[in-house]
Amino acid sequence: LEFRRVLFRSATIKPFKGIRPPQDLVEQVASRPYDVLNSEEARAEAAGNDKSLYHIIKPEIDFPVGTDEHDEKVYAKAAENFRLFRDKGWLVQDDKENYYIYAQTMNGKTQYGLVVGAYVPDYMNGAIKKHELTRRDKEEDRMKHVRVNNANIEPVFFAYPDNAVLDAIIRKYTAQKPVYDFIAPGDGFGHTFWVIDNSEDIAVITKEFAAMPALYIADGHHRSAAAALVGVEKAKQNPNHRGDEEYNYFMAVCFPANQLTIIDYNRVVKDLNG
């Protein structure tokens, strides 16, 4: 039985009701990922902008300089700010479950990714492949963030095997006017976004992923681990767990393998300890 589960393993995804900014606010809300800058850099980038997502993903910026970013009051502030953003209409949930296309342009190259709900059991059983070890302290930090917000505020990036059917769907939508299209001042990258709301296209995308043997984490090992572990927690805490609840999925942007660029990730050893 165990062999059959491994042999016929496939990728499970689902559409979801995204929570996102109105078109006229997207440039004010958008931020860089939480782990590419420190607290003071985030504080500087968010200065004078109460709509910046940094108030949710780096909420220590709303406290005096030097506040421990892992203090419980900081996580509580993230949840408070997330509620505030929704109450004020700075983040609005879509009415129906969709897939999305997110394109990122940097150094003259554009990569197109499908934004999906990835399946927690796929992470736990190895259908989502990892290539990094994770640290428990960093996992717990992101787990607390997921718990207090009851949401994945930032996506993880996956890679998937090249697929002509998905390529055609992406081309069809990206030939249309995007919902968002802007260059972020923080990184100079282009960010473009489309909504896939056609039920037939949604069904085809789901089917094509189901035929894939695996997905591969390109970026976001700690966020993936945190989302999956919180999903497992919630399943254990729910006596009526069915397997189709929202906590069984987490937000991922999936890019085809032919659009990936492998970049050096170098380190300098300054001290050989004697």
Placement of each model-derived feature along the sequence:
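Surface-exposed, charge/polar-rich loops and edge strands
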Residues: F8-G274
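Short, small-residue-biased leader/transition segments that mark boundaries at the very start
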Residues: L1-L7
